[in-house]
């Protein structure tokens, strides 16, 4: 098992910051609340609980040791983040969202996770199970908040930009104001962007990040300018201009980010009407 990472408190208690899911899974298994399935090699264990193992095998399992990296309570968030990244350098590299979840635990990231579980939001953002399990919903939520506040300050690399935003919000953030911003955006998208919402087409199982950023932040900026906005249609989603702005090429370019976000804003506000379509 990979190293576990924990923080040592004032009374030497350990709080796991990386590996809690592994520990919980082991506890569930040893308590007979988890049944093995989907094993490709040890197929004879499929459908079996811990108590189904021979006594000798159970004892050997329980005697296996764990390896811990212990971080003192004096370590700064930056040090914790650095340690977390260093111990997660296996071939199955953590996503930026997974790293952030372990490195920046606190009220703000708890809020990001809370928003990511919103049923309306998940309905608007189709996603594969593997993406869901690797923190993609949290990634999208964080991008919405970070870009809606600071897209004009974005330079190039998204990951460090988001990390900096999280660290700033860990110190102070207006939870209710941000929750309202997120909820209002989702409600608007659900009402006016059906049936595709953030996907390219109905029944898609993918939510492209560049498309999500453009629509979500563009909606927020348009509503900020006109809270009573009721667009006639969103046909511009099918325009050549929008498709060009939401391709993945140069997606991390600050000029492209600004362009696609403000394009959506201006289309919603009726400031862009002379657009080109495939049949033009």
Positions of predicted regions on the chain:
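Terminal end segments
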Residues: 258-264
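Basic- and aromatic-enriched surface patches that contact anionic nucleotides/nucleic acids
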Residues: 1-163, 243-254, 258, 269, ...
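Short amphipathic alpha-helix initiation/capping segments at coil-to-helix junctions
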Residues: 134, 175-182, 204-212, 257
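Small-residue-rich helix-loop
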Residues: 156-197, 201-204
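Eukaryote-specific, cytoplasm-facing alpha-helical/coiled-coil scaffolding segments in long proteins
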Residues: 166-173, 240-248
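Amphipathic alpha-helical interaction surfaces
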Residues: 29, 147-151, 168-171, 191, ...
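C-terminal hydrophobic structural anchor segments
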Residues: 196-243
């Amino acid at each position: 098992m990979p190293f576990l990472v924990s923080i040592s408190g004032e009374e030497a208690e350990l709080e796991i910051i990386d590996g809690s899911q592994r520990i919980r899974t082991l506890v569930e298994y040893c308590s007979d609340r988890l049944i093995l399935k989907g094993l490709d090699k040890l197929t004879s264990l499929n459908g079996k609980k811990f108590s189904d193992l021979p006594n000798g095998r159970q004892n050997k399992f329980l005697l296996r040791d764990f390896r811990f990296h212990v971080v003192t309570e004096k370590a700064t968030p930056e040090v914790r983040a650095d340690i977390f990244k260093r111990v997660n350098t296996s071939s199955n590299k953590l996503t930026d969202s997974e790293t952030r979840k372990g490195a920046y635990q606190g009220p703000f990231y708890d809020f990001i996770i809370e928003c990511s579980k919103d049923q309306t939001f998940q309905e608007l953002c189709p996603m594969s199970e593997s993406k869901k399990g690797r923190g993609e919903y949290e990634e999208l939520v964080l991008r919405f908040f970070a870009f809606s506040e600071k897209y004009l300050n974005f330079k190039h690399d998204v990951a460090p930009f988001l990390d900096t935003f999280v660290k700033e919000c860990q110190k102070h953030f207006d939870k209710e104001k941000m929750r309202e911003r997120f909820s209002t955006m989702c409600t608007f998208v659900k009402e006016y962007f059906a049936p595709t919402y953030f996907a390219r087409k109905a029944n898609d199982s993918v939510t492209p990040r560049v498309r999500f950023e453009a629509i979500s932040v563009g909606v927020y900026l348009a509503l900020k300018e006109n809270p009573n906005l009721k667009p006639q249609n969103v046909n511009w989603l099918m325009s050549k201009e929008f498709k060009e702005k939401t391709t993945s090429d140069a997606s991390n370019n600050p000029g492209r980010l600004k362009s696609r976000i403000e394009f959506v804003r201006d289309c919603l506000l009726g400031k862009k009407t002379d657009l080109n379509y495939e049949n033009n």
